[in-house]
Amino acid sequence: MWIGIISLFPEMFRAITDYGVTGRAVKNGLLSIQSWSPRDFTHDRHRIVDDRPYGGGPGMLMMVQPLRDAIHAAKAAAGEGAKVIYLSPQGRKLDQAGVSELATNQKLILVCGRYEGIDERVIQTEIDEEWSIGDYVLSGGELPAMTLIDSVSRFIPGVLGHEASATEDSFAEGLLDCPHYTRPEVLEGMEVPPVLLSGNHAEIRRWRLKQSLGRTWLRRPELLENLALTEEQARLLAEFKTEHAQQQHKHDGMA
């Protein structure tokens, strides 16, 4: 996968290119990241990249000419078929389904805004899609862009060590992840669930699915509203609810 970055702070993306899963993907040639700074496309000696908004008000906008020229340079480098994305609080909220959808693209250009944003006409003429990582304000689009790159790159064949890792990730099936355990078997009196030590892969799979369903029901119940549960999932969720109620009753009795 090829990803182009439009950012006033391209050095921030060393966190993606030099470290972790994405760093290995870049090193192994599975992920290619190039960046363009609008500051390199300015025509004045001060390399100004912000401008006042029409109508007044606080803050500045990114200057149109350097930004557009940077986008055009990225498009030229990408060639045909690159989707241009603007990271914006007004965009579609990124979720696992969206990540999976974006991962089908071989080329992405990510535009990172700064200041109060960018001219609406640039969005209309240069941007294919707007995406948001949540309903809150950040200082720029770099962190959302890195979030998008990290999540999308997990779907690139060969990036993850285990072929099933991406499909078994939290949210991959619309559910939260199940609890995980490693050594020691007993930590401050708390034991690893015996089923995970049993070697019975069918029972382990069943336990993990039940815990995933239950954790989603407890923490993010709205996610279940969008799912059509299978017969097995519905049965396991009912079991979890019964067990949870029994545990709560026992806890209340001890209080």
Swiss-Prot record:
EC number annotated for this UniProt entry: 2.1.1.228
GO biological process, one term: tRNA N1-guanine methylation
Gene3D superfamilies xrefs: 3.40.1280.10, tRNA(m1g37)methyltransferase, domain 2 (1.10.1270.20)
Predominant subcellular localization, coarse grouping: cytoplasm
Secretion signal, residue range per the UniProt entry: none
UniProt superkingdom: Bacteria
Keyword Transferase: yes
UniProt keyword list: Cytoplasm, Methyltransferase, S-adenosyl-L-methionine, Transferase, tRNA processing
Cellular compartments per GO CC: cytosol
Record InterPro entries: Alpha/beta_knot_MTases (IPR029028), tRNA_m1G_MeTrfase_C_sf (IPR023148), tRNA_m1G_MeTrfase_TrmD (IPR002649), tRNA_m1G_MTases_N (IPR029026), tRNA_MeTrfase_TRMD/TRM10 (IPR016009)
Any GO MF annotation of the entry: tRNA (guanine(37)-N1)-methyltransferase activity
Subcellular location as annotated: Cytoplasm
CDD domains attached to this UniProt entry: TrmD-like
Entries under Pfam families matching the protein: tRNA_m1G_MT (PF01746)
Reactions listed under catalytic activity: guanosine(37) in tRNA + S-adenosyl-L-methionine = N(1)-methylguanosine(37) in tRNA + S-adenosyl-L-homocysteine + H(+)
Chain positions recorded as S-adenosyl-L-methionine binding sites: 113, 133-138
HAMAP family: TrmD
Subunit: Homodimer.
Function: Specifically methylates guanosine-37 in various tRNAs.
PANTHER family xrefs: TRNA (GUANINE-N(1)-)-METHYLTRANSFERASE (PTHR46417:SF1)
Family according to the record: Belongs to the RNA methyltransferase TrmD family.
Protein name from the UniProt record: tRNA (guanine-N(1)-)-methyltransferase
Species this chain originates from: Escherichia coli O81 (strain ED1a)
Designated gene of the protein: trmD
